C-alpha cells in the first residue's frame, strides 16, 4: 500500500488550517487518515507549525512519501534534513511572542473607562428609576414613623 504524508484541510472559508496526516495515496484530500502527525496554520503570524518529529521519522523510514507542501514544512522544521542526513537548517523557526496578560488587562480597563460616561455611573447596579423609587419609599417610611 502506497502511503503519503499530506495536508488535510480544515478551518473556515479563507481561513485554512491544515493537519499533517499519513494516509493512503488513493484517499481523498480530506478523507480517512491513518495517523495525524502535525498541524499547520498558515494564517497566523508567524505561521503555526507543530510536527511530531518522532512519528515523521518513523513514517519516512517505512517508505511514506511526503507531498511537496509537506516536504517544504518538514524542511522548515529540520525533519527532512534529519531523515536525509543533511545538516540542520540555519534559519530557525519564528516563535510567537507570549501575550502579556497584565498589559492586555490594563488596555481593557482603559477602554472601559473611556466608554463609561462621567456622572452616569450606577453604584449598586440599580437604574435611576429604581433608585428614585427606593428613595421615595424611604421618605414615606420616615414620614409615617414621625
Swiss-Prot record:
Keyword Transferase on entry: no
Family per similarity comment: Belongs to the bacterial ribosomal protein bS16 family.
Gene Ontology terms: cellular component: cytoplasm; small ribosomal subunit
Alphabetized Pfam families for the sequence: Ribosomal_S16
Organism per entry: Thermobifida fusca (strain YX)
Keyword entries, A-Z: Ribonucleoprotein, Ribosomal protein
Name of the gene: rpsP
InterPro entries noted in UniProt: Ribosomal_bS16, Ribosomal_bS16_CS, Ribosomal_bS16_dom_sf
GO MF term list: structural constituent of ribosome
Record-level GO BP terms: translation
Disulfide bridges in this chain: none
Chain intervals for the UniProt region annotation (Disordered): 119-146
Annotated Basic and acidic residues bias: 128-146
Entry protein name: Small ribosomal subunit protein bS16
PROSITE patterns: RIBOSOMAL_S16
Origin: domain of life: Bacteria
Amino acid at each position: 500500500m502506497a502511503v503519503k504524508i499530506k495536508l488535510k484541510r480544515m478551518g473556515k472559508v479563507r481561513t485554512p488550517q491544515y493537519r499533517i496526516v499519513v494516509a493512503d495515496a488513493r484517499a481523498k484530500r480530506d478523507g480517512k487518515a491513518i495517523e495525524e502527525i502535525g498541524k499547520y496554520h498558515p494564517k497566523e503570524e508567524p505561521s503555526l507549525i507543530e510536527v511530531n518529529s518522532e512519528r515523521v521519522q518513523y513514517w519516512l523510514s517505512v517508505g511514506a512519501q511526503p507531498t511537496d507542501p509537506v516536504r517544504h514544512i518538514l524542511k522548515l522544521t529540520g525533519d527532512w534534513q534529519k531523515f536525509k542526513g543533511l545538516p540542520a537548517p540555519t534559519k530557525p523557526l519564528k516563535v510567537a511572542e507570549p501575550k502579556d496578560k497584565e498589559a492586555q488587562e490594563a488596555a481593557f480597563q482603559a477602554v472601559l473607562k473611556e466608554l463609561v460616561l462621567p456622572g452616569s455611573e450606577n453604584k449598586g447596579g440599580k437604574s435611576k428609576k429604581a433608585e428614585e423609587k427606593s428613595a421615595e419609599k424611604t421618605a414615606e417610611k420616615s414620614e409615617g414613623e414621625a
